[in-house]
Amino acid sequence: MLKVNADFLTKDQVIYDLVIVGAGPAGIASAIYGKRANLNLAIIEGNTPGGKIVKTNIVENYPGFKTITGPELGLEMYNHLLAFEPVVFYNNLIKIDHLNDTFILYLDNKTTVFSKTVIYATGMEERKLGIEKEDYFYGKGISYCAICDAALYKGKTVGVVGGGNSAIQEAIYLSSIAKTVHLIHRREVFRSDALLVEKLKKISNVVFHLNATVKQLIGQEKLQTVKLASTVDKSESEIAIDCLFPYIGFESNNKPVLDLKLNLDQNGFILGDENMQTNIKGFYVAGDCRSKSFRQIATAISDGVTAVLKVRDDI
């Protein structure tokens, strides 16, 4: 059983059994199971509830739904959670301290939240191209969310960078809206599911640029041209484009917990054992921010459930 020394708290401050950071599939699953176990818990979510799936056009691999849009699935999950009337802080987490066996969570609205345990389920952040003017053109021709911004480019020319499932899925989606979709991939072979690739290859308004990387973003007030460089012979070419959607992977969203000195893998993802317990007692990790081999909706939910059941047993 976890013993908490909370002598530094004032009498009107609540100390929760559990605070869950993130309301994606992992966090929502944790919260549902936690509420059913009668844990006194709270959730912190500074972005759209539902997590990364709300930026996905179509989900076809989640049991119970042959085909469902990402926003619809995220809303279904979140409405299920809301039926339990949880405490939710709709704020961004700034940092976490650990004092006298109590976790202190600082939010961007100056609120401070106290808890015996934490399940950290913040998912991942989109990896940027890392080239000049990328931040400058964000919202002016650079977007990391096709489902959010595709309608702005109806009948126009767009590009997608990447070769995984996300890139291929969003290229398929954009092909139904844009005049032309340029798919830019640094390799000859895609990492995406073969069925998705075959589907994309059958779409007439998709142009493939394989063995190519984005070298330069060109434009004045907005993005106008993308310069590509061949990974084979270094030759360069240019594409006139209205918007570029990079889908080149993700990075761990670990900035608020770096001061805790959690054990991380070489890519910055948080290490947890089979029960999602980190090297700090009472601090658990679940979902895509955890170091693991596979990142799917189903695996995130499994992480979240495992973590909260361990919390239930330890409280």
UniProtKB/Swiss-Prot annotation:
GO terms classed as biological process: cell redox homeostasis; removal of superoxide radicals
Catalytic activity: [thioredoxin]-dithiol + NADP(+) = [thioredoxin]-disulfide + NADPH + H(+)
Cysteine-cysteine disulfides: C145-C148
Main location: cytoplasm
Record localization: Cytoplasm
Note: The active site is a redox-active disulfide bond.
Similarity annotation: Belongs to the class-II pyridine nucleotide-disulfide oxidoreductase family.
Protein name: Thioredoxin reductase
Organism: Mycoplasma genitalium (strain ATCC 33530 / DSM 19775 / NCTC 10195 / G37)
